[in-house]
A protein has these predicted regions:
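A domain-start/cap signature at the N-terminus of enzymes
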Residues: 25-87, 124, 220, 254, ...
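Gly/Ser-rich "nucleophile elbow"/oxyanion-hole loop immediately N-terminal to the catalytic nucleophile
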Residues: 78-82, 142-183
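Short, solvent-exposed loop/turn and secondary-structure capping segments
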Residues: 83-85, 98-104, 137-142, 190-192, ...
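The conserved beta1-alpha1 loop
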Residues: 89-93
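Active-site machinery of serine-nucleophile hydrolases
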Residues: 94-160
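Short glycine-enriched nucleophile-adjacent loop
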Residues: 186-198
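Catalytic active-site module of serine/aspartate enzymes centered on a nucleophile-bearing elbow/loop
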Residues: 284-302
């Protein structure tokens, strides 16, 4: 009896140790912190005046010039008038946000970092779009629209008009427009980017980082799985490079598999524990792979 009791206690201890080791590898603190890797990029300071090579400026589409709405535009360091460039369009995460790792998100377009990390400041026009309030008069930092309706219509309208406007005025190639986003912005890649047939036509490829439309039910209308599937059906084979901190990308992989929708999906863990798009301001194997993936698409897209 004592032998059986000791054996059970040993098994329990072994299970506890095994569970702890498993948690170390797949838990929220499993991967290294971004602070362990030195940055090789720094966001350009926000400047006033007209857009030009290497400048990061606030702008407003002319249709909204009597409102508080604005977006951010960065023209690549090697930008020249009359030349053509692929475009990275980005949506920010919710804000204000801060976690126990010190990861922060303001929720404003100027807090976005993905596009600059992906481009390194060269070769791509980088456009950070806003989410608009229910009345279309200002930017919002949580979801889109206002509680409880979270009406996306003004957000959609601004994107539909601003992306072609930026391409027309600054040499963006309308056939090579990437859509990326962090957290809320990751969800927005599909929720906003594939919301209807008109906006879905704007993009050549997608890079959602941390969360994915349909995986989890959120507080805004239309976050249910069936609605997300109807949006995903508008993807129509275009490639997506889906990333997440730690092992969270598996939730996206499993949900997409369950939908039965086939496509050109790439799934990668970022290699960091952080819920923070600043990981792309640091060198990493995944950032290198994402850049190569984008370059290949720009070469094959007509």
């Amino acid at each position: 009896v004592e032998s059986q009791k000791a054996s059970k206690e040993m098994s329990a201890r072994s299970l506890a140790i095994a569970s702890h080791i498993f948690a170390l590898f797949v838990g929220t603190d499993a991967a290294p912190d971004i602070k362990s890797v030195k940055t090789d990029l720094k966001l350009p300071a926000l400047q006033t005046g007209e857009a030009n090579a290497g400048k990061r400026v606030k702008q407003t589409h002319p249709n909204w010039d009597t409102t508080e709405v604005y977006h951010l535009l960065h023209l690549p360091n090697n930008w020249k008038p009359g030349a053509s460039y692929p475009v990275i369009v980005e949506y920010a995460g919710n804000g204000p946000y801060k976690n126990h790792h010190g990861d922060k998100s303001s929720g404003h377009p100027e807090g976005s970092k993905m596009g600059y990390g992906l481009s390194g400041g060269n070769d791509y026009i980088w456009l950070c779009l806003p989410y608009l309030s229910d009345n279309g008069q200002k930017n919002v930092t949580r979801w889109w629209g206002n509680q409880p309706s979270h009406d996306p219509s003004h957000t959609l309208d601004y994107a539909k008009k601003t992306v072609p406007w930026v391409c027309e005025n600054f040499g963006g190639d309308t056939e090579k427009v990437f859509l990326c986003g962090f957290s809320r912005g990751s969800i927005a890649c599909n929720f906003i980017g594939l919301h209807d047939d008109e906006i879905a036509k704007l993009w050549c490829a997608f890079l959602p980082y941390s969360h994915y439309d349909g995986v989890k039910r959120w507080s805004y209308p239309g976050s249910d799985s069936q609605s997300a599937i109807s949006r995903l059906n508008r993807l129509k084979g275009r490639p997506q490079f889906i990333t997440h901190e730690n092992n969270g990308v598996e939730n996206s992989r499993n949900w997409i598999k369950e939908t039965g929708i086939e496509g050109d999906f790439t799934f990668r863990a970022t290699g960091f524990r952080n819920h923070n798009d600043a990981w792309l301001l640091r060198p990493s194997p995944v950032r290198k792979e994402m850049r190569a993936w984008m370059k290949k698409i720009t070469k094959t897209t007509n």
